[in-house]
Structure formats: C-alpha cells, structure tokens
C-alpha cells in the first residue's frame, strides 16, 4: 500500500500560496459587488416597487436555481455570442461577474429578512419626527439590519471563497488551478489536493475568527 508523501505535501504549499492573491481578489471583489446588488434587490422587494419588484423576484429565482458553473459558462462563453463587444472580457472578469450575480441573489434574501426583523414602528416613528424615508433607513433601519445580517452574510462569503475554485474551468489561474497543474506535473494528486484543502480550511478558520470579533464589536452597543 502506498503511503502519503508528507514532505511533498508540505513542499506544495509555497506553490499554492502564489495563487492565493488571485483567489482572495476574486472572493473579495465578488463579495463587494454582491453586497451592493443584494442590498438594492432587498430594498426593492421590501418596498415592493412596481415592476422592479417582479423583476427582482425573477432574478433571485433564476440565480438561486441555476448551478454556479452553468452561470459562469453562460457569462464567459454565452454572452460574447450575443454581444460581440464582450468577447474581450477576461476569464477573471467573467468569474467575478458570475460569482457576484449569484451571491447577490442569496444576499438579497438575507438582507430582506434582516430588514423585516426591524420593527416597522421604528420607520413610522422616524417619519413622524420629520425624517425622510432615506434618512430613516440610513440612520436607524440599516444599522440594525446589517447587525442582524452579519452571521448569514459571513457564511455566504465562506461559500463564495470556496466557489472561486470553479473559476479554473474558465482558465483562471487561482489556487485550485495552481494545485491541479502542480499535481499533474508530479503525479502526486492526493498530497497536492490535500494541501489545497488545508489552505481553504485555514482561510475559512481565519475568516470565522475575524467575523466573530466583528460580531462582538457590533453587538457591544446593544449589551446591557
């Protein structure tokens, strides 16, 4: 029976780390756009804006119902067929767009639930003292909703971080693609993919710790 080459596995880490910036850039950029998109969708559905409300529900249903890999292929290979000017779009850009659109749909539901968790009476109270609806949301409603949405939003980011590994199918040289090439060159598949798994695991642990610290900081003003 073959044994695990631990020395080789350890030697794979420096190679994998070289692609870590691409992985993190993809995840962070996609999350920023997803948060913006998700918040807009949540506000539309919360306020039931005519036409936009129906379109947002359709958007959420589509991107939650279609596999992420199919979405990436539709964007990278399909859109240039309909819009030739998009043929210059890079694989990295397509991956960020795809991951942003998909996660915006999930975050929209998270943010909508967070907004609904804030008592409607607070909005009425803000309006009664002369605040505009925009001021009420910015100063009172959104800060509370954001606090309520942090745990689920953090879980979404962890999922997004792992989904960046799908970008290798478009040709993006992120961490999983780097590991795949390294394994093919040395025929040490188990050791290499185990090293890849450990890096992703460590990243999620680090992020979970940071999220926990952030949650505590956000909860401090509400403690009695």
Swiss-Prot record:
GO terms for molecular function: L-cystine transmembrane transporter activity. This is Probable amino-acid permease protein YxeN. Its main location: membrane. The keyword Transmembrane helix applies. It comes from the Bacteria. Probably part of the ABC transporter complex YxeMNO that could be involved in amino-acid import. May transport S-methylcysteine. Probably responsible for the translocation of the substrate across the membrane. Keywords: Amino-acid transport, Cell membrane, Membrane, Transmembrane, Transmembrane helix, Transport. GO terms for biological process: L-cystine transport. The keyword Transport applies. The complex is composed of two ATP-binding proteins (YxeO), two transmembrane proteins (YxeN) and a solute-binding protein (YxeM). One of its GO terms (cellular component) is plasma membrane. The gene is yxeN. Belongs to the binding-protein-dependent transport system permease family. Residues 20-211 form the ABC transmembrane type-1 domain. The chain crosses the membrane at residues 3-23, 24-44, 58-78, 91-111, 157-177, 190-210. InterPro entries: AA_ABC_transptr_permease_3TM, ArtM/GltK/GlnP/TcyL/YhdX-like, MetI-like, MetI-like_sf. It is found in: Cell membrane. It is a multi-pass membrane protein.
């Amino acid at each position: 029976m073959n044994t695990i080459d631990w020395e080789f596995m350890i030697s794979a880490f420096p190679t994998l780390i070289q692609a870590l910036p691409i992985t993190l850039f993809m995840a962070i950029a996609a999350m920023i756009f997803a948060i913006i998109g998700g918040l807009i969708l949540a506000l539309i559905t919360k306020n039931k804006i005519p036409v936009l409300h129906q379109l947002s529900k359709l958007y959420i249903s589509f991107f939650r119902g279609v596999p992420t890999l199919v979405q990436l292929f539709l964007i990278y290979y399909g859109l240039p067929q309909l819009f030739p000017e998009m043929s210059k779009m890079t694989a990295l850009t397509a991956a960020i767009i795809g991951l942003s659109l998909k996660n915006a749909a999930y975050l929209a539901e998270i943010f909508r639930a967070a907004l609904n968790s804030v008592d409607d009476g607070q909005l009425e109270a803000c309006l009664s003292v002369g605040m505009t609806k925009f001021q009420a949301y910015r100063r009172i409603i959104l800060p509370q909703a954001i606090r309520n949405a942090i745990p689920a939003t953090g879980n979404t980011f962890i999922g997004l971080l792992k989904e960046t590994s799908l970008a290798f199918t478009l040709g993006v040289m992120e961490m999983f693609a780097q590991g795949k090439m390294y394994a093919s060159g040395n025929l040490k598949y188990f050791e290499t993919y185990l090293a890849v798994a450990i890096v992703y695991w460590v990243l999620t642990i680090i992020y979970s710790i940071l999220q926990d610290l952030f949650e505590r900081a956000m909860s401090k003003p509400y403690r009695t």
